[in-house]
Amino acid sequence: MKRSNIDAMICRQEKITDITRETINKIQLDKLNAVLKREKERQGFYRDLPERLESLDDLKTLPFTTESDLAQKGGRMLLCSQGEIQRIISEQTSGTTGAGKRVFYTEGDCEHTIELFMAGLGEFIYPGSRTMVAMPFSGPSGLGELIADAIRRIGAHPLLTGNNKTYGELKTILEEERPDTYVGMPTALLSMLRMCGKGSIKRALISGDACPETVMKAIEKILGTPLWPHYGSREMGLGGAICCQAHEGMHMRENHCITEI
């Protein structure tokens, strides 16, 4: 079995030849301590945290950052100037009337996201593929745009479908554009397959929403191939983890995110 694209991406980004748990732990601790030191020097939002941790186990002594923190004090968390911000995603938390949380991305953050999308999508999208991108398109550096950019860099062709097409419009795209791959939310994909047929679609990545096992099995039965689930959130730069060709779990972008499961 070949190495997953995400593992290869991490090796390339960190200039290492192989991934071991010890290597990942060192990368994570070194990067975390660099951020803590920089934050202590600039007296920002996290100024009261220790300047250095001796091990990743020390993370359990640190307080959580809450949605309220992001909404009320997100600007103070920046480690760059406002002029370096390329994209801001705002979200109004349900049940509240106050300020929504805001997550900021620099050009470098967006580039890392594109590289992750290239690694994940590159497991099943090939040069020349035609891919329906049924995700929100909200302007430069939005989710749909970043996915489309990653597909172009692979050498494939993104169809900027968006997430608000009618079944009639989707059927027209399937018949006229003949996509072989699909990126979108699981329930929307299942609805399209049931209402419009699968057309020429052979493979699909699902993201943006939880996917119950019953929905996953129903989609896989129609397509006749395993799904490629992706996990991400705004706080982790939109991209977090995706399965590889073994389909036995997900690979995290562990050089950028520390996860607790």
Where are these regions (language model features)?
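Acidic/glycine-enriched edge-of-secondary-structure segments
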Residues: T97-H112, A148-D149, G155-H157, T172-D180
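Short glycine-enriched loops at secondary-structure junctions
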Residues: R87, C110, P136-G139, T187-A188
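Nucleotide 5′-phosphate-binding alpha/beta core
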Residues: M1-Q92, A99-H112, A119
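Conserved AMP-binding loop of ANL adenylate-forming enzymes
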Residues: L121-A156
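Active-site glycine/GP-rich loop and adjacent strand/helix microenvironment
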Residues: M1-T23, I27-D30, A34-V35, H157-I261
